[in-house]
Every structure is written in structure tokens, then in C-alpha cells.
């Protein structure tokens, strides 16, 4: 599995050229993309500026010597490469297994070309077998938890050891065990309109390419764009 993730990450790095501003994703597959960019900066003199999606990726990039800029200092990003926890047949996805979904979505939004790197196990018919992360403000989080419980979403607070995990943005994450999300777009809109929800892990209609690594090799899926 790790070998497949590495192949996907290294393949994505081939789309990066001199002078680009690039979004550096978070997670086990994006890790290999960032490593490969670091290698190219060091060995090939690749000139890029990175924008990171988590404190974890910031530390990784700094160690590798990748120059970084804050999201607030840029207007657009040429290319962002990130992982995904599930991708459905319509190229909607669930992200946030690494608890970085808010920063990931903020970086993805001004990106001209958004690429996901995954292994074949992440490609699914319907989203929802992977729990959907919902980032919520700490104030009123328990009340919101009860609302989700009443709606039948089977919520659970994301934990770190014995206490609730706190994200880089100082919020909690409630994971929803939905089983199958029949209409991710409608459910995304529902969560967008829920007071106390900062962001959710449904990335609908955002990705441009999905690089899938399997035992048979690497496939690059181009997402059809609505005309």
C-alpha cells in the first residue's frame, strides 16, 4: 500500500514546473508528493513556492527546504496536490481523515488545477463508508452533536488520546457515520447552512484530475468539466 501511495505522489509531482505556486496537501499519500518536490528543489534546483494545508505539512516542507508563503499573501495557486479518503464515480470526495479539511478547502478554492492522489481502494461507487468529518466551533459543539444524533447521523467526536482533538484552527471535529451519502451535493448544502459548522469534508465538484495507483500501475483520470 505504501508503495502505491508513493507512486501516486511522485506521479503528481511531474505536473509541477519552475515558477509555480503549489498547494501542498496533507496525509499519507500527499506526503510523498511533498517529499518528491523537496527532492527536486534540492537536486534539480526546482523553483517553486508552496502553500501548506496543515501544521504537519508546514514542518515537512520546512525540513525539505521548500520555500513557503501564507495563503493570505497569494491570490491564486497554479496546482494543488492532496489525498482523498473516498472518491465516487462523479468525482465528489470525502477528505479530512487527517483533520486538515478546513485548510485543505481554503487552499483548494483559489487553485487553477486541483489533483487528488489516491490508491485504488479509495475509489468507490457511493461516498459514506468513510466517516464524514465536520469541523465545528467549540462553542455549542455538544448541542450540535445532539442535533446530528437526532437526525440519525451517528456522530462521534474525533479524539486525540483521552480528549477531543483540536484542529489547527482550534475547532472540534464531529465524524458522521452515514454509511451511504446518496446525494453528496445536497448534503453538503445542508451542512453549509448549519450554524456552528465551520466546514465539512465533502469536496464536491472541485477536483480536476485523480491519480490512482493500483497493483496494475498508475491511471490519471481527467474529470469531465461541465460545458
UniProtKB/Swiss-Prot annotation:
Annotated active site: 104
> Subunit comment for this entry?
Homodimer.
Q: Which family does it belong to?
A: Belongs to the ribose 5-phosphate isomerase family.
Q: Which residues of the sequence carry a binding annotation for substrate?
A: 26-29, 82-85, 95-98, 122
Q: What class of enzyme is it?
A: isomerase
Tell me the keywords, alphabetical order.
Isomerase
Q: What is the lineage of its organism?
A: Bacteria, Bacillati, Bacillota, Bacilli, Lactobacillales
Identify the species of origin.
Streptococcus pyogenes serotype M28 (strain MGAS6180)
Name the pathway.
Answer: Carbohydrate degradation; pentose phosphate pathway; D-ribose 5-phosphate from D-ribulose 5-phosphate (non-oxidative stage): step 1/1
The name on file for this protein is Ribose-5-phosphate isomerase A
Q: Which Pfam families match?
A: Rib_5-P_isom_A
Under catalytic activity, the entry for this protein gives: aldehydo-D-ribose 5-phosphate = D-ribulose 5-phosphate
- Name the Enzyme Commission number(s) assigned to this protein: 5.3.1.6
Amino acid at each position: 500500500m505504501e508503495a502505491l501511495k508513493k507512486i501516486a505522489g511522485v506521479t503528481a509531482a511531474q505536473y509541477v514546473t519552475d515558477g509555480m505556486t503549489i498547494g501542498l496537501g496533507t496525509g499519507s499519500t500527499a506526503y510523498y508528493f511533498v517529499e518528491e518536490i523537496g527532492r527536486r528543489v534540492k537536486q534539480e534546483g526546482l523553483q517553486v513556492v508552496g502553500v501548506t494545508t496543515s501544521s504537519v505539512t508546514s514542518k515537512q516542507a520546512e525540513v525539505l527546504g521548500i520555500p513557503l508563503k501564507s495563503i493570505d499573501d497569494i491570490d491564486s495557486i497554479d496546482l494543488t496536490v492532496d489525498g482523498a479518503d473516498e472518491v465516487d464515480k462523479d468525482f465528489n470526495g470525502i477528505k479530512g481523515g487527517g483533520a486538515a479539511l478546513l485548510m485543505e478547502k481554503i487552499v483548494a478554492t483559489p487553485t487553477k488545477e486541483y489533483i487528488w492522489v489516491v490508491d485504488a481502494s479509495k475509489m468507490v461507487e457511493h461516498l459514506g463508508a468513510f466517516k464524514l468529518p465536520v469541523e465545528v466551533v467549540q462553542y455549542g459543539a455538544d448541542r450540535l452533536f445532539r442535533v446530528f444524533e437526532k437526525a440519525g447521523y451517528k456522530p462521534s467526536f474525533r479524539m486525540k488520546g483521552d480528549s477531543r482533538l483540536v484542529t489547527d484552527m482550534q475547532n472540534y471535529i464531529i465524524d458522521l457515520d452515514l454509511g451511504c451519502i446518496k446525494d453528496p451535493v445536497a448534503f453538503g448544502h445542508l451542512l453549509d447552512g448549519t450554524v456552528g459548522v465551520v466546514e465539512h469534508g465533502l469536496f464536491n465538484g472541485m477536483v480536476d484530475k485523480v491519480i490512482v495507483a493500483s497493483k496494475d500501475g498508475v491511471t490519471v483520470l481527467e474529470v469531465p468539466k461541465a460545458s
